[in-house]
Curated annotation (Swiss-Prot):
Taxonomic path: Eukaryota, Metazoa, Chordata, Craniata, Vertebrata
Leader peptide range in chain numbering: 1-17
Binding-site residues, heme b: 374
Impact upon substituting residue 519 to V: Loss of cyclooxygenase activity. Loss of cyclooxygenase activity
Protein name: Prostaglandin G/H synthase 2
Protein family membership: Belongs to the prostaglandin G/H synthase family.
Length: 604
């Protein structure tokens, strides 16, 4: 009888044993598989490593690791020695070779086809085929682990609001030392919300952006039904209205396309565009208006070139051209600015034609979380000679009509944005959005910040002070989390020490860049079958793509061709800032923090 009791106790104890993969034992992208209840096996296939935990490098891997400089060394080289890079930029074969390496080395860090999602921490047909999920760079932490992050850290995670209050919330506006402006901030917001479209009815692991990339559904609508409501069905154009001699989006009443507006917004200010949340702030509607004008302008160009084409072909070809323009602007203007490189990035799909590369993409949940760059937002928005606080700015398209697109472009080009890394720079107006980012990451069972660093071949941080580069926030972090290997992804990205004179820390760049470049170059228009003049209506359409820039987009569609770029033109606006954030509070506590939080727009 005693023997039976002991056996029963042993079985019960075994059934409550933690999943052996909770400790994330497999290194260097090795895959952990449980064997029985208390054993695991690491699959090191094609990792370049071997051993029980995939920790021993093969001979060629050892040589590569010895020769490979650290990411910070590469960043230093690319952001210094301007004279050398000026020479390289003017030697086509050298520039092409370096750009090709940048694209392949970054893109190969992304699994394609996708591997995991929030409900499947192992390879499955469901994880591959179900487009309604965001994919995952790392599988979720197993359900039966001793702690929320696996085996490290406390048994209960710190209160998300406490994290935001102590580490993320702005005390005083910290400008971006790279000089990013509000044209950049709103471009980032407008561009990314064609593929960051969380389905909040189903949960943060699900997306409504089934195109999983640059398909411009934020211009044309996610569904065919919405697209048809927005189209004019004449000469390929989108519906529009003329106000004071300039083109603006049509109204909800004229299109019957659903948009999110509060009841108090009058009908004539309820503009209808592809993304239903873009009525939130005039900065988003500014870009929506500019791209509407660009689509209809391209239709006119194609109509002149191809009078024989009907409405459908003009529409579809114009959409492909705008996709090409978008990718070109993102790589050569937007990413170029973010990088701070003296090396000139180049959009040229032919660089990958002789490489092993898959022309498909799946948006990762971690990429969505990483892109919550709310510290970019200022305390107030300066348009011409007027300042608007958040309560005056949101859902107020009358500002757009009052000032006009030209004044918006001029003003946002001059207004500096905030620094993202370094901590304590999230505006109080979006405090609840930052808190939701932490809560949703927990719901999706993200692995720790250091596990993501290892996944992207970065050395894990060994101390809190190494992470933040200062003492005050590192002490707060340690009190909250207890273990550097238990710090969560989103808070760590925002408190990580910035690179010298940079907007981001190392991890934001080294994790974000692979997702970004794979998503851009994995677009179907970049494939050999598509990347040819005939796809875009001939040389005229191809030329529109190959000469696109943020300045040309503005000049072609905004009265007076105001100067613009993604950085402030006046160097005096860029002030030297310290790595650690100020501990004094800003004066924006009276703003209702829930004002930007609507059920379907928390990513904004």
């Amino acid at each position: 009888m005693l023997a039976r009791a002991l056996l029963l106790c042993a079985v019960l104890a075994l059934s409550h044993t933690a999943n052996p993969c909770c400790s994330h034992p497999c290194q260097n992208r090795g895959v952990c598989m449980s064997v029985g209840f208390d054993q695991y096996k690491c699959d090191c296939t094609r990792t370049g490593f071997y051993g029980e935990n995939c920790s021993t490098p093969e001979f060629l891997t050892r040589i590569k690791l010895f020769l490979k400089p650290t990411p910070n060394t590469v960043h230093y080289i690319l952001t210094h020695f301007k004279g050398f890079w000026n020479v390289v930029n003017n030697i086509p074969f050298l520039r092409n070779a370096i750009m090709s390496y940048v694209l392949t080395s970054r893109s190969h860090l992304i699994d394609s086809p996708p591997t995991y999602n929030a409900d499947y921490g192992y390879k499955s047909w469901e994880a591959f085929s179900n487009l309604s999920y965001y994919t995952r760079a790392l599988p979720p932490v197993p359900d039966d682990c001793p702690t929320p992050l696996g085996v490290k850290g406390k048994k209960q995670l710190p209160d998300s609001n406490e994290i935001v209050e102590k580490l993320l919330l702005r005390r005083k506006f910290i400008p971006d030392p790279q000089g990013s402006n509000m044209m950049f901030a709103f471009f980032a917001q407008h561009f990314t919300h064609q593929f960051f479209k969380t389905d909040h009815k189903r949960g943060p692991a699900f997306t409504n952006g089934l195109g999983h990339g640059v398909d411009l559904n934020h211009i044309y609508g996610e569904t065919l039904a919405r697209q048809r409501k927005l189209r004019l069905f004449k000469d390929g154009k989108m519906k529009y209205q003329i106000i004071d001699g300039e083109m603006y989006p049509p109204t909800v009443k004229d299109t019957q396309a659903e948009m999110i507006y509060p009841p108090q917004v009058p009908e004539h200010l309820r503009f209808a565009v592809g993304q239903e949340v873009f009525g939130l702030v005039p900065g988003l509607m500014m870009y929506a208006t500019i791209w509407l004008r660009e689509h209809n302008r391209v239709c006119d160009v194609l109509k002149q070139e191809h009078p024989e084409w009907g409405d459908e072909q003009l529409f579809q070809t114009s959409r492909l051209i705008l996709i090409g323009e978008t990718i070109k602007i993102v790589i050569e203007d937007y990413v170029q600015h973010l990088s701070g490189y003296h090396f000139k990035l180049k959009f040229d799909p032919e660089l990958l034609f002789n490489k092993q590369f898959q022309y498909q993409n799946r948006i990762a949940a971690e990429f969505n979380t990483l892109y919550h760059w709310h510290p970019l937002l200022p305390d107030t928005f300066q348009i011409h000679d007027q300042k608007y606080n958040y309560q005056q700015f949101i859902y107020n398209n009358s500002i757009l009509l009052e000032h006009g697109i030209t004044q918006f472009v001029e003003s946002f080009t001059r207004q500096i944005a905030g620094r993202v890394a370094g901590g304590r720079n999230v505006p109080p107006a979006v405090q609840k959005v930052s808190q939701a980012s932490i809560d949703q990451s927990r719901q999706m069972k993200y692995q720790s910040f250091n596990e993501y660093r290892k996944r992207f071949m970065l050395k894990p941080y060994e101390s809190f002070e190494e992470l933040t580069g200062e003492k005050e926030m590192s002490a707060e972090l340690e009190a909250l989390y207890g273990d550097i290997d238990a710090v969560e992804l989103y808070p760590a990205l925002l408190v990580e020490k910035p690179r010298p004179d940079a907007i981001f820390g190392e991890t934001m760049v080294e994790v974000g860049a692979p997702f970004s470049l794979k998503g851009l170059m994995g677009n179907v228009i970049c494939s050999p079958a598509y990347w040819k003049p005939s796809t875009f209506g001939g040389e005229v359409g191809f030329q529109i793509i190959n000469t696109a820039s943020i300045q040309s987009l503005i000049c072609n569609n905004v009265k007076g061709c105001p100067f613009t770029s993604f950085s402030v033109p006046d160097p005096e606006l860029i002030k030297t800032v310290t790595i650690n954030a100020s501990s004094s509070r800003s004066g924006l506590d009276d703003i209702n923090p829930t004002v930007l939080l609507k059920e379907r727009s928390t990513e904004l």
